[in-house]
């Protein structure tokens, strides 16, 4: 029987002093106290040990350990002592008498403690007066790390503020049995136990990377006990079906100390196989030595294609319409970053969530309260897990309303708020604040300074593509392809999997007849077959069966989807469970329920029809997918006399199609998930261009084909001074390439970073924002929703003007330009009869989208909530961009993606008083950042509504190109030679060698 914890009931015999307000003197105890009952950083031993803390006396003999990495020289006052949050071995189970703890520690204990701290990449912090240990911090150049408030942070753990974690379980089962295996500390266990992810922590300094810690979820998922896990390598999960090639990749990753994310077939203790999405992340010290590995597992058997991943259609394209592995890897990579941060800084979790752990009621009552704060902002969530809840898993959905009972699925696939859940779009008075930026938690989120936060910042600035509109339709439906034998399923929604209990691997490539059973009416089935043969739609009710044999009444609607020629591409099958509305006597669904259900499934089918048209036809050949990239690009009217076009025209006049051989690599400009951008020179000229090269295989595997095709189509439409021109596009055997303008000024993001305070003055913000407004106006007029406005995508031209770039996340729809006649009051009519009223030009994209794309910090609320979005998302992003130019950071940024999304939906907009800004610019940003898109500036009259705001007073919109750029503290071109020594890009040379 596993022992249980027994909290101590013996009260303390000594009373701690209190200050003038009656608060406990915790941080400054009286000098009369020789020592506290529970010394700082000395947690009580777990109840399962039933012995005193041996570290209160001379240290016990320990087995010889591997040498720890060398540490920088510390000051004399930084005395190394063993702290409670290091990886410690089990003390020998013998009775040890308690002795008075003094400041003096044996040298061996000090050396051992410092070694253990070094293995975690940490340093010990001591009190400058007494030399007593005061905490452990991340190693930095200064050698110490203090609390932002100038105080030494302390934390004390007792039996009252924690519960039994999986780490305690694992350690309890091996009491000293594996003395050679270091165990994670109590504080680290406490931090890790707050996460709901399934993961293990392995020791990279030991041979074979033994497991030091396993979460409770790992034991539940695999069926193994802690005694069978701790101290072993994870290979016990492997079996006959585990891919050897994938295992070789994992071994190479571990040897190199790199990250890994992949799906492998593993086996539980009872022999059951399951698909495991494994993400490995290394924990390194400041010298780059790998100390630990975190291995996060997610069982994805329900949603993955599994063995069907490599299944191909006769045309060579994947059998599945969507590649789900790419979706799952994106979410897993983001989720594991939280675990990495917890292992690197175990205390950071409790410090960030429990801002005032020792505050008494009397103290909290005296704190000034903000009248405009929301109730949700006044509550600091607990960082420790308790019976009532816990830290939110980053892969769970965001909910503004109380959550319903979670589904049994092991993976919440979307990881976001469902469309069906209500979103409070009202703007209350507390949404905007003009006070001091004194929220410590917010300040930590908004201004990260540590190395880890900088890594997180780099990740959060990348564009994300989490789901297409099709994937976000949360109804029970499948899509089949009648052009293939037996009309197989090529797409199944997550909701359909939940309803039928089948996994995606089990149904892809199969006909829907597997839902039939003993009581399924064959006459009704014949109606469906006739509709398929005749390519017509039909709506029926029939009994179907789940995988477990449970029957349900299905209101089923079949609808063909036709292409522009009128030929059937797909069949859409929508199911609705009507079992709750069955009349017991007649054993049929109630008539009113049937009518409502039929209307719902038909409406859903229409939405699916529109959504699936965003994707390329699955019956295309791979050559057809990239055919547009081989077309000749024709010159646009406003660019025909420019030097770049004249140079391109000379090549075209020779009759030879432009290809990779016409360009010479100069240097790389950047890289992303699907490709890279290079500076190239047209051979035989001095004309420079930017070439974007995208890997075809990566585009297919990451569901990016339709994005790349849309970007090529969008670039071919553009003819505007604040947007790039497309000069050529071509393909090689492995890549597709786009040739566009090169802008020597670089990114607005880097321009901001070069400024002394990382911000721009208000006149500069006005200049760049005005040009962005004009560029967005043109895009919207062309029916383009940009969807990825951020400083990285605002490039600076040679003359100082801006140009938007990167349209792979943009949406191309239709647009209907309108002329709006302003309404005039009757009293003013007579006065204005002589002057003709100027009509307002408005052109906004007509069709809404619901795909989950954008950049984390710039995504609008309606994208997160799944309510569907229009071009209003670009005006939201403009508000975020202006805020970042003014203050140097975005207003809703969080330490995790989930926190950022929560902030976007809930957090108040605040303008810090540390940087002066006019009322006009604050009002403009506030109106652009309305959570309800119907109330957002630009919704009614488009760009004209934004132009008319008082912040832009004095802007001559017709002659905006003639406006001189503002003077900056650090100029755009700082005198460095633009055409310096040219560096040949090996990657592009290799690409050139493999030209088609």
From Swiss-Prot:
Residues annotated as domain PAS: 184-257, 462-535
Positions bound to FMN 2: 511, 513, 516, 529, 544, 554, 556, 575
Residues modified as S-4a-FMN cysteine: 234, 512
Domain Protein kinase as annotated: residue spans: 663-952
Regions of compositional bias (Acidic residues) in chain numbering: 434-443
Regulation of activity: Autophosphorylation is inhibited by staurosporine, but not by tyrphostin 9, sphingosine, GW5074 and BML-265.
Post-translational note: Autophosphorylated at Ser-185, Ser-350 and Ser-410 in response to blue light irradiation. 2 molecules of FMN bind covalently to cysteines after exposure to blue light and are reversed in the dark.
Main localization, broad class: membrane
Cofactor comment text: Binds 2 FMN per subunit.
Tissue: Present in guard cells (at protein level).
Description of the deletion phenotype: Enhanced drought tolerance, when associated with PHOT2 disruption. Plants lacking both PHOT1 and PHOT2 have curled downward leaves missing color changes and lower petiole angles in response to weak or strong blue light (BL). Impaired proton H(+) pumping associated with altered increased ATP hydrolysis and absence of binding between 14-3-3 protein and H(+)-ATPase (e.g. AHA1 and AHA2) in response to BL in guard cells of plants missing PHOT1 and PHOT2.
Domain PAC, first and last residues per copy: 258-312, 536-590
Record-listed FMN 1 binding positions: 233, 235, 238, 251, 266, 276, 297, 302
Family affiliation: Belongs to the protein kinase superfamily. AGC Ser/Thr protein kinase family.
Subunit-structure text: Homodimer; disulfide-linked. Interacts with PKS1, PKS2, RPT2, RPT3, PHOT2 and BLUS1. Subunit of a complex made of CAR6, PHOT1 and RPT3/NPH3. Associates with CBC1 and CBC2. Binds to BHP.
Protein known as: Phototropin-1
Organism, scientific name: Arabidopsis thaliana
């Amino acid at each position: 029987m596993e022992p249980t914890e027994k909290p101590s009931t013996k009260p303390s015999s000594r009373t701690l002093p209190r200050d003038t307000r009656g608060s406990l003197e915790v941080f400054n105890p009286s000098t009369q106290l020789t020592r506290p009952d529970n010394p700082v950083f000395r947690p009580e031993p777990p109840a399962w040990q039933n012995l005193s803390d041996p570290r209160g006396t001379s240290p016990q003999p320990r087995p010889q350990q591997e040498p720890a990495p060398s540490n920088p020289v510390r000051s004399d006052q930084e005395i190394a002592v063993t702290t409670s949050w290091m990886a410690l071995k089990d003390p020998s189970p013998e009775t040890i008498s308690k002795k008075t703890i003094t400041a003096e520690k044996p040298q061996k204990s000090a050396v051992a403690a410092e070694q253990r701290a070094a293995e975690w990449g940490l340093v010990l912090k001591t009190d400058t007066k007494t030399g007593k240990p005061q905490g452990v911090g991340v190693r930095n150049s200064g050698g110490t790390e203090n609390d932002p408030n100038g105080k030494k942070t302390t934390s004390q753990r007792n039996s009252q503020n924690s519960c039994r974690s999986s780490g305690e379980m694992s350690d309890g089962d091996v009491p000293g049995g594996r003395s050679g295996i270091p165990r994670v500390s109590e504080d680290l266990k406490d931090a890790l136990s707050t996460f709901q992810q399934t993961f293990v922590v392995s020791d990279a300094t030991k041979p074979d990377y033994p497991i030091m810690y396993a979460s409770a979820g790992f034991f539940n998922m695999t069926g193994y006990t802690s005694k069978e896990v701790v101290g072993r390598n994870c290979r016990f999960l492997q079996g006959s079906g585990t891919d050897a090639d994938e295992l070789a990749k994992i071994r190479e990753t571990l040897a190199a100390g790199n990250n890994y994310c992949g799906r492998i077939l593993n086996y539980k203790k009872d022999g059951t196989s399951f698909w495991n999405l494994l993400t490995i992340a290394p924990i390194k010290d400041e010298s780059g030595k790998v100390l630990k590995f975190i291995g996060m597992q997610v069982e994805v058997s329900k949603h993955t294609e599994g063995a069907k991943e490599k299944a191909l259609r006769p045309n060579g394209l994947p059998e599945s319409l969507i590649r789900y592995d790419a979706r799952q890897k994106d979410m897993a990579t983001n989720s594991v970053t939280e675990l990495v941060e917890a292992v690197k800084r175990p205390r950071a979790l409790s410090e960030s969530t429990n801002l005032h752990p020792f505050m008494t009621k009397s103290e909290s009552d005296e704190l000034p309260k903000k009248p405009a704060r929301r109730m949700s902002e006044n509550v600091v969530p607990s960082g420790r897990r308790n019976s009532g809840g816990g830290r939110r898993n980053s892969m769970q959905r965001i909910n503004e309303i109380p959550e319903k009972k979670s589904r049994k699925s092991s993976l919440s696939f979307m990881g976001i708020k469902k469309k069906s859940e209500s979103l409070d779009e009202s703007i209350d008075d507390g949404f905007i604040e003009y006070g001091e930026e004194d929220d410590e938690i917010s300040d930590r989120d908004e201004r990260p300074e540590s190395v880890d936060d900088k890594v997180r910042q780099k990740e959060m600035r990348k564009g994300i593509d989490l789901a297409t509109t099709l994937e976000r339709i949360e109804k029970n439906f499948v899509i089949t392809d009648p052009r293939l034998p037996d009309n197989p399923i090529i797409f199944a929604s997550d909701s359909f999997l939940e309803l039928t209990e089948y996994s995606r691997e089990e149904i892809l490539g199969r006909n829907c007849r597997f839902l039939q059973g003993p009581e399924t009416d064959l006459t009704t089935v014949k109606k469906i077959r006739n509709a398929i043969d005749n390519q017509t739609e039909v709506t029926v009710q029939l009994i179907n069966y789940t995988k477990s044999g449970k029957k349900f009444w299905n209101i089923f609607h079949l609808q063909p989807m036709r292409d522009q020629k009128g030929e059937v591409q797909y069949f859409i099958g929508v199911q609705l469970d009507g079992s709750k509305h069955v009349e017991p006597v007649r054993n049929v669904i109630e008539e009113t329920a049937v009518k409502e259900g039929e209307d719902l499934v038909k409406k859903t089918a229409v939405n699916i029809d529109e959504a699936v048209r965003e994707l390329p036809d699955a019956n295309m050949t791979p050559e057809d997918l990239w055919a547009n990239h081989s077309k000749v690009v024709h010159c646009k009217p406003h660019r025909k006399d420019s030097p770049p076009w004249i140079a391109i025209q000379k090549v075209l006049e020779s009759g030879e199609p432009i290809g990779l051989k016409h360009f010479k690599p100069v240097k790389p400009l950047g890289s992303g998930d699907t490709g890279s951008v290079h500076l190239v020179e047209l051979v035989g000229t001095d004309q420079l261009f930017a070439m974007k090269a995208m890997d075809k295989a990566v585009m297919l595997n990451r569901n990016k084909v339709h994005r790349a095709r849309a970007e090529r189509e969008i670039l071919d439409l553009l003819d505007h001074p604040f947007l790039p021109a497309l000069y050529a596009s071509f393909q090689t055997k492995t890549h597709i390439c786009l040739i566009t303008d090169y802008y020597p000024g670089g990114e607005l993001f880097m321009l901001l970073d070069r400024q002394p305070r990382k911000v721009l003055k208000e006149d500069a913000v006005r200049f760049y924002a005005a040009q962005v407004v004009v560029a967005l106006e043109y895009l919207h007029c062309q029916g383009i929703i940009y969807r990825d406005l951020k400083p990285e995508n605002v490039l600076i031209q040679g003359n100082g003007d801006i140009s938007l770039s990167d349209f792979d996340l943009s949406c191309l729809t239709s647009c209907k330009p309108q002329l709006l006649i302003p309404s005039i009051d009757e009293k003013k009519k007579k006065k204005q009869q002589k002057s003709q009223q100027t009509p307002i030009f408005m052109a906004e994209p007509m069709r809404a989208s619901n795909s989950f794309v954008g950049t984390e910090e710039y995504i609008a609320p309606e994208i997160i909530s799944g309510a569907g979005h229009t071009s209003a998302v670009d005006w939201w992003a403009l508000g975020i961009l202006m805020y970042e130019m003014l203050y140097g950071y975005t207003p809703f940024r969080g330490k995790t993606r989930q926190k950022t999304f929560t902030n976007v939906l809930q957090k108040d907009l605040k303008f810090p008083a540390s940087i002066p800004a006019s009322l006009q610019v604050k009002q403009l940003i506030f109106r652009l950042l309305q959570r309800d898109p119907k109330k957002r500036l630009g919704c009614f009259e488009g760009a004209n509504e934004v132009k008319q705001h008082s912040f832009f007073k004095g802007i001559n919109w017709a002659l905006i190109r003639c406006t001189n750029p503002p003077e900056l503290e650090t100029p755009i071109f700082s005198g460095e030679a633009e055409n310096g020594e040219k560096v040949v890009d090996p990657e592009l040379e290799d690409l050139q060698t493999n030209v088609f």
